[in-house]
Curated annotation (Swiss-Prot):
<dbReference type="InterPro" id="IPR036096">
    <property type="entry name" value="Ataxin_AXH_dom_sf"/>
</dbReference>
<feature type="compositionally biased region" description="Polar residues">
    <location>
        <begin position="28"/>
        <end position="43"/>
    </location>
</feature>
<dbReference type="GO" id="GO:0007613">
    <property type="term" value="P:memory"/>
</dbReference>
<feature type="modified residue" description="Phosphoserine">
    <location>
        <position position="359"/>
    </location>
</feature>
<keyword id="KW-0804">Transcription</keyword>
<feature type="region of interest" description="Interaction with NCOR2 and ATXN1">
    <location>
        <begin position="20"/>
        <end position="197"/>
    </location>
</feature>
<feature type="domain" description="AXH">
    <location>
        <begin position="455"/>
        <end position="586"/>
    </location>
</feature>
<keyword id="KW-0597">Phosphoprotein</keyword>
<feature type="modified residue" description="Phosphoserine">
    <location>
        <position position="282"/>
    </location>
</feature>
<dbReference type="GO" id="GO:1902035">
    <property type="term" value="P:positive regulation of hematopoietic stem cell proliferation"/>
</dbReference>
<keyword id="KW-0966">Cell projection</keyword>
<feature type="region of interest" description="Disordered">
    <location>
        <begin position="261"/>
        <end position="294"/>
    </location>
</feature>
<dbReference type="GO" id="GO:0003723">
    <property type="term" value="F:RNA binding"/>
</dbReference>
<feature type="region of interest" description="Disordered">
    <location>
        <begin position="185"/>
        <end position="223"/>
    </location>
</feature>
<comment type="subunit">
    <text>Homodimer. Interacts (via AXH domain) with NCOR2. Interacts with ATXN1 and CIC. Directly interacts with RBPJ; this interaction is disrupted in the presence of Notch intracellular domain. Competes with ATXN1 for RBPJ-binding. Found in a complex with CIC and ATXN1.</text>
</comment>
<dbReference type="Pfam" id="PF08517">
    <property type="entry name" value="AXH"/>
</dbReference>
<comment type="similarity">
    <text>Belongs to the ATXN1 family.</text>
</comment>
């Protein structure tokens, strides 16, 4: 017979019973303590129920708690009713069994045989694994296929105890849950329910003793809402991307505590790679521009060459440094944060070399630094000349042309170098390509008053687009024609319809080499007055000859730059000129070698007018009288195929009548009235 208190205890629920600890239980506790010594790392993982062996008189089960609760004298049926157990904090009071089993009502597929309870004479129901409490580790499977290969030492040591044997073959399929990775290596905080959305958290620095391969390789750019990903160990040298995982002997520069200095250190370690990449980049850029930018390109060239990204974009294998498709958009934001940090340290982004990247960095994206400077350098024309000349005169350059902007007069570009007009011509390299913009003697002298009485040809920042093959020219009759299809009759009819203009002729009497390299000097006899005019033009500049069409001193170079078929200009050729009809019967002629549609600026002398689509910066850029406020013609855009308006409609629309026009034409000038004409470039008429 059992004592009365034992029988009364059986009628009570398990939680209400008094559970005295007998000497037998104490003995078993002592023996079990010698068999299993819990470690501090395993304390969070060994919470559960310890099932004790049974004696001849009945089953005795000790619940691991604070040592204050125990169940004695339970029958097998009563024992099977136990399903919820207490959670021990850090110590155990097992009853001498060789194994410790976590218990919980899980599906039957997780049940284990009762052979864990070593008693051959009694049949016991199956023992269940205990469900992990809310404070313990939880794993979730990725809702998408992970592109990351997780190494065996993926989890920090506070999360897995040495006694927990989790198959390493399953590890690549798990990712740490959000709250398990804390800012410091503290006990695991409360984890959210697995039903919650997948969140990312900051990384924790794991103890160095348990993770020898990853103890010093935490990601550098971590913020709330980001999840660190541990990659396979990299076998690359230290000069590559910063987020790679190195071997056990990794350099300490990659520790999170030195994240800021790691950027500089990694840049220093990759010096050889950068030098190799700088040479590769310099082949793609113009020599002058790349030399000026080389110091700023060094840190970033390492990023862009061969598709590498200096921000350490995350990929399945760190050895492949090109950005990969990511499962979540948050990782793209991580890259932006790192790139932003680099930009704040005065790193220059040259993503424009990558044409296929829409780049959120922008790395953005895709513009060169000097290109942006060229667009905004109207206040500094000298800098614009220096930066844009390579785009203009070297078609093989990969840089895009910029819009035309007015340039200072009397400046020379020789082989990409800006040369003042006072420079001795003998100092300029022979064969250097110099383009000229039309300039008045007065303006040239005002620019360099003390240097030279007769200024040299002035610079041009781009090729005139209206000479490009396919450019559309609008005649005075309203008809549109391509520049290569123009004929002599088109000029004649346009001058007749215009009213204020008349066709004149300019005969070539001599062609000489100019004192300025890259130019030729042409001598003309113009109009009825047989005025002698000398101009200096590039040899590729086209002229329109009666009955022949476009001609130039160098047809091959004209075809190369403009794709415009030309004949060779020779002595005796008669070029088309347009004369402005004078109201007082004094003809002020304007010799022309270009079709209608000339660009004009209102700053030049009042008596000047223009014929043809000549460019402002090219030697044929001529201007309408500023006093009259008229402009002979103007192409819409300085680009190939752009439409250029013929001078006549604009002239009629803006020209002034009566005494105002008469006064403007009789205004005194430095050149005599009867020889006031200009075909293109600088004119020596009347000197």
């Amino acid at each position: 017979m059992k004592p009365v208190h034992e029988r009364s205890q059986e009628c009570l629920p398990p939680k209400k019973r008094d559970l005295p600890v007998t000497s037998e239980d104490m003995g078993r506790t002592t023996s079990c303590s010698t068999n299993h010594t819990p470690s501090s790392d395993a304390s969070e993982w060994s919470r559960g129920v310890v099932v004790a062996g049974q004696s001849q008189t009945g089953a005795r089960v000790s619940l691991g708690g604070d040592g204050t609760e125990a169940i004695t004298g339970l029958t097998v049926d009563q024992y099977g009713m136990l399903y919820k157990v207490a959670v021990p904090p850090a110590t155990f009071s097992p009853t001498g069994l060789p194994s410790v089993v976590n218990m919980s009502p899980l599906p039957p597929t997780f049940n284990v045989a009762s052979s864990l309870i070593q008693h051959p004479g009694i049949h016991y129901p199956p023992v269940h694994y205990a469900q992990l409490p809310s404070t313990s580790l939880q794993f979730i499977g990725s809702p998408y296929s992970l592109p990351y290969a997780v190494p065996p030492n993926f989890l920090p040591s506070p999360l897995l105890s040495p006694s927990a044997n989790l198959a390493t073959t399953h590890l690549p399929h798990f990712v740490p849950y959000a709250s398990l990775l804390a800012e410091e290596a503290t006990p695991p905080p409360q984890a959210a329910s697995p039903a919650q959305s997948f969140n990312k958290s900051s990384s924790a620095t794991s103890p160095p003793g348990q993770l020898p391969h990853h103890s010093n390789t935490q990601p550098l750019d971590l913020a709330p809402g980001r999840m660190p990903i541990y990659y396979q160990m990299s076998r690359l040298p230290a000069g590559y991307t910063l987020h790679e995982t190195s071997t056990a002997g990794a350099s300490p520069i990659l520790t999170p505590q030195e994240g800021q200095s790691a950027l500089e250190a990694a840049a220093a370690n990759g010096q050889r790679q950068r030098e190799r990449n700088v040479r590769r980049e310099s082949e793609a850029l113009d020599s002058a521009s790349s030399k000026g930018e080389s110091q700023g390109l060094v840190p970033v060239v390492e990023c862009m060459a061969d598709g590498q990204l200096f921000s350490g974009s995350q990929t399945p294998r760190v050895e492949v440094a090109a950005p990969a498709h990511r499962g979540t958009p948050d990782t793209d934001l991580e890259v932006q944060r790192v790139v932003g940090a680099l930009a704040s340290q005065d790193y220059r982004v040259v993503a424009a070399q990558r044409k296929d990247e829409p780049s959120p960095l922008n790395l953005s994206h895709h513009n060169l630094d000097h290109q942006g400077e060229g667009r905004g350098s109207a206040r500094n024309p000298t800098e614009l000349v220096e930066k844009s000349q390579a785009r203009v005169f070297y078609p093989q350059s990969h840089q895009e042309p910029v819009k035309h902007r007015p340039l200072p007069k009397a400046m020379v570009v020789a082989n990409g170098n800006l040369v003042p007009t006072g420079t001795d011509p003998s100092l300029l390299p022979v064969g250097s390509e110099i383009l000229v913009a039309s300039s008045l003697d007065l303006q040239a002298r005002a620019t360099f008053p003390d240097k030279e009485p007769t200024p040299p040809p002035v610079t041009s920042s781009h090729l005139p687009s209206h000479f490009m093959k396919g450019a559309i020219i609008q005649l005075a009759t309203g008809e549109l024609k391509r520049v290569e299809d123009l004929q002599t009759q088109d000029f004649v009819r346009s001058a007749e319809v215009s009213g204020g203009l008349k066709i004149d002729s300019s005969t070539v009497v001599d062609i000489q080499e100019s004192q300025w390299p890259g130019f030729v000097m042409l001598h003309f006899v113009v109009g009825e007055q047989q005025s002698k005019v000398s101009i200096e033009v590039p040899p590729e500049h086209p002229f329109f000859v009666y009955g022949q069409g476009w001609s130039s001193c160098s047809p091959g170079r004209t075809a190369q730059l403009f794709s415009l078929p030309c004949h060779r200009l020779q002595v005796g050729d008669v070029c088309i000129s347009i004369s402005l009809q004078s109201l007082n019967s004094n003809s002020v002629s304007q010799a022309s070698c270009a079709p209608p549609g000339q660009l004009g600026t209102p700053r030049e002398r009042p008596e000047r007018t223009v014929l043809g689509p000549r460019d402002l910066c090219d030697s044929e850029g001529k201007n309408q009288p500023s006093g009259e406020g008229s402009r002979v013609g103007e192409p819409s855009q300085p680009e190939p195929g752009a439409q250029a308006c013929w001078p006549a409609p604009s002239f009629q629309r803006f020209s002034m009548q009566g005494e105002e026009a008469r006064a403007a034409m009789l205004r005194p000038s430095f050149i005599p009235q009867e020889v006031k004409l200009s075909i293109e470039g600088r004119s020596n008429a009347g000197k």
